[in-house]
Amino acid sequence: MHRPLRYFRDFLTGSASLNPARAISAPVAVAAGLLALGGCGSSDPALYSLAPVPATQAVTVDTQVPAVIEVRMPGVPPSLDRQNIVGVQDDYSLSTLSAAAWSEPLAPMLGHVLSTDLQQRLPGRTVFAQNDATTVPAQAFVEVEITRFARDGAGLVHLAGSLSVHRAGDPEHGLSTPLDLTAPATGSGTRAMVAALSQLTGQVADMAARQLGMLPPAPEPHHG
């Protein structure tokens, strides 16, 4: 590793010999030097993904739950919508993990995991995420806004924001609730935090399933 760098330095300063053999090898030395410099200063971050989690209680699907449900793309603020994972998020500060990144943009990943969680909790219903390829029109929508999605300074994992559900064409009779969920991580590493965030996302699915069963009946169509 040091010899190409020495040739690279000598070539730039003009101290390298200009005999034919050295002249031919000079471009090779330059290329090797650049590769060596690039290889010493870069490393790819580890990639992490949220994962669906099973329901913690037996599921009884209310007859009022609409047959087809769409999980809208979650709202994620720019402070969280970044490639590198936010490791700590407190009231006045936020820090990212330089060696850890999400495997895909956070908003669509969260939407797909939430739709999978909700499908597990609503057997017999069809649940899909916004922008999924489907020709079935949704009869109800689940919307999530995220404001907090990381550890705090003490190590407790938070998922905060809001959850709302409503029938298609009837948003004024929808139901909404604030989200302020916490879970202890099983360790201090990034994997433990992502696992805790996955558990909290499953709790959001639990809440959405209950709210969908509490929606008022679909309005009767008007006949003119």
Segments predicted by a language model, with ranges:
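Soluble periplasmic/extracytoplasmic beta-strand elements of cell-envelope proteins
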Residues: 68-74, 86, 141-145, 158-164, ...
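Surface-exposed short loop/turn segments
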Residues: 41-58, 121-169
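Short secondary-structure boundary motifs at beta->alpha junctions and helix caps
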Residues: 93-101, 169-207
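N-terminal secretory signal peptides that target proteins for export/translocation
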Residues: 1-21
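Sec-exported extracytoplasmic/periplasmic mature domains
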Residues: 115-123, 209-217
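C-terminal motif of bacterial Sec signal peptides marking the signal peptidase cleavage site
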Residues: 35-39
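A structural "domain/chain start" motif
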Residues: 40-106, 217-224
